Design a protein with these regions (language model features):
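Acidic/histidine-rich catalytic cores and adjacent linkers
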Residues: 1-23, 55-225
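Inter-helix linker motif
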Residues: 24-40
Length: 225
């Protein structure tokens, strides 16, 4: 009775446990995990584009070492494969966090591969849904589903079906604003601290690091009142 809402990913086993242990709780799909579905679909599209470029590159003459001669024919497949291989972070990151170089790479993708860029916009569109929340978020999600269904990118068409399947829990997250973002961030930081604490003989040092860095623990230092 004390648990009224549960934020979790969409795994079936989690739904079963919540239904068994907290039958009256409202289950909310965690926005971080839902957007991660779109990010995974986008990366699958990037790998498809990269593999297509590698296939083209294999049909091109092998390049010799050193600077190519002036009469050497262009190798668009090699160049495209090279640039796409390093495009992951430009596609993954939020637009406001892009470096100048990553922004240029994204602009190159928009110009040279409209399908991959459309996949990027779909990922950003789903992220926007959770930034507006509430009824506006649900209206935006309706538009996103319609767009994804007719985008002609099979993996995003399948993602639209998955979103519809879990629509009730996603709507609940939009209504109640629940997210595991803070917990996920804290877990990531603790993993970093675990690497820092490697080599200590017991977990006490790791616990102390976590308390100091993340727990708000501010002990009084000797000689400093």
């Amino acid at each position: 009775a004390l648990i009224t809402h549960v934020s979790a990913d969409a795994a079936d086993w989690i739904a079963d446990v919540v239904a068994d242990r907290c039958p009256d709780a409202i289950r909310c799909a965690d926005p971080f995990h839902v957007v991660a579905w779109a990010t995974e679909a986008l990366d699958a599209e990037r790998r498809r584009a990269w593999n297509d470029a590698r296939t083209l590159a294999r049909s091109e003459p092998k390049r010799r070492r050193g600077r190519p001669a002036n009469h050497t024919p262009p190798s668009p497949g090699h160049e495209r494969a090279r640039r796409l291989k390093g495009a992951r972070y430009a596609l993954w990151k939020n637009p406001e966090d892009l470096t100048e170089r990553q922004s240029q790479k994204l602009a190159w993708i928009a110009k040279t591969d409209t399908r991959l860029y459309r996949a990027y916009l779909l990922k950003e569109g789903l992220r926007h849904v959770f930034s507006v929340k509430g009824q506006d978020g649900k209206d935006a999600l309706d538009k996103w589903i319609s767009w994804a269904r007719r985008c002609r990118i099979p993996i995003f068409v399948e993602l639209a079906r998955r979103i519809v399947k879990h629509r009730d829990t996603i709507d609940a997250a939009l209504d109640h604003g629940l997210s595991q973002g803070l917990i996920e961030s804290t877990n990531t930081k603790i993993r970093v601290l675990t690497r820092i604490a490697f080599g200590f003989h017991n977990p006490t040092a790791l616990i102390a690091l976590a308390m100091l860095a993340l727990g708000g623990h501010r002990p009084t230092l000797p000689g400093r009142g």
